Amino acid sequence: MTTPERICLPGLPTTTDPAPVITQMVRRASSLGFETWWRRVESVGFCTHPIQLVGAGSVGSRQVVWTRCNNRRAAVCPSCSDLYARDTWQLVHAGAAGGHHNMPAEVAARPQVFATLTAPSYGTVHNATGARCHPTSTSPGSRCIHRKPLRCNATHSMGDPIVGQPLCGQCYDYFGHVLFTWHLPELWRRFTIALRRAVAAQLRARGMDRGLVRVSFVKVVELQARAVPHIHALIRLDPPSALTTQSDQNHYGPAATCGGGEPLSDTGSSGWVSPITAGELAALIQSAARQVRVDVLALDGDVRELRFGTQIDAQPLSGEAMGEPVGTGLMARLSPRRVAAYLAKYVTKSLQDFGITARRLSTEAIATLDVTEHVRAILTTITQLAECVRPMAGIGRWLHTLGYRGHITTKSRHYSTTMGALRAARATWTRRQNTKHVEHQGTTRPDWRNIPVTEVPADVDADDVLWKFDHAGHASAGERTLVYSAALQRIHTRQVGLVEARRQVRDQHGDPPGGHDG
């Protein structure tokens, strides 16, 4: 007798009983209000965790609005995650290649370096390099002080759950691991200060004014297989700028209240040539990253020095947007288009792969989590530091991020456009399309006072409505599964369309410089 195949529904844990969820799906799909509900779902791009707001207008009419959750994590909402990744691509590419989103085309000619700053080694872990993990050495009987073998002759794949796990958990420095994760934002801040000072010193050594160059950047934090974060950053040298204009305020937002000494506008910089080359910038990045230190209190009360690891990489970008020939190998991968796709891929990651949800955890929940012993040891170390080291008392609130308290994506003020500007432009476009649709229909507007809607009608001023949060998410797991499936289908359709469009472009004009973004 054969065992029937288990049904796995998209967006749900494999341990979920599918029968009641399927019943909910059928009930919703066969309901009288399905078409109205589906239009609402479609209006927010098949968001799987939509926010519902309710409000009353100046005349007392009730309005209901659905809006996206805008969560960047693919495990929470594939639709909003995909949109976040595409916005990130636009932001990074505009800053690297220019020519769109109010970024001048001249930025493509400026020195740019793609840098990766990693964490130090806190113990030997299993890896997936394509070769044997830790092959037997000349002394095959070598073991650690805990009598565990320091070798592994297996060749692990990227999906192997053992990748990133320490060969000996007792030898692994979990306190150093957690301290680095917690203080990584401060390490990055000090790195940017050190880099700006290094650039200024380079200019002074050549008898030039230190104000001739401004450092701009965008960075993305990625969690390695060993569950420690490292940084990918695209760093660019810009010309000095004029005073802030209203256009600066519109495009970049207000300046930081505490200052920062950054120039504000690229007005009149079309003929600027950087006195520092991309190769020299890469060397300055390497030097600055190696000299940065942060002294912190450890569990035993001693001072511990934190720093970046030895694997610091800094590679100049190629000149895709200027029509320069792009070679093969590394330089081909480091065109603006490639780097933008590379960074956009990482912003949608979450700790779901480590068995941790995006919601806050309690200390009591650590023992019951379905995670590896490595992750459990990290969580336990976080709680110990929160209890015993006074300056780190707040780390206990960041169990769900394994102690990382910074943003995944950050940028300097003038590197590129902002996520808010991209969303505002998209909202404006959507309103115009909806207005065109209503005008094309040539019908009288419905009575919005008695009909819940997914968007504020054009004849209702959103500023005159007092909006209140009503709830988030769908009414049942069945509804969420329907929406989740539709989101995946839309993403797949868009990707197929992009591949076909690029194929047609290649057939007509040949491969674009730098390749495509995948």
Regions found by a protein language model. Give the residues of each.
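Long, low-complexity, charged/polar intrinsically disordered accessory regions
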Residues: 1-85, 94, 304-518
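Generic recognition of stable, solvent-exposed alpha-helical segments in well-folded globular domains
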Residues: 72, 182-186, 190, 276, ...
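Histidine-centered divalent-metal-coordination microenvironment in nucleic-acid enzymes
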Residues: 77, 115, 208-246, 343
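Generic, well-ordered alpha-helical scaffold segments in large soluble proteins
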Residues: 83, 190, 194, 198, ...
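Short helix/loop capping segments that flank catalytic or ligand/cofactor-binding pockets
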Residues: 85-89, 93, 123-128, 242-245, ...
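Signature for HUH/AEP ssDNA processing cores
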Residues: 97, 101-223
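Hydrophobic alpha-helical scaffolding
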Residues: 177, 181, 271-275, 307, ...
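Helical (often loop-to-helix) elements that flank the catalytic cores of nucleotide-handling enzymes
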Residues: 234-301
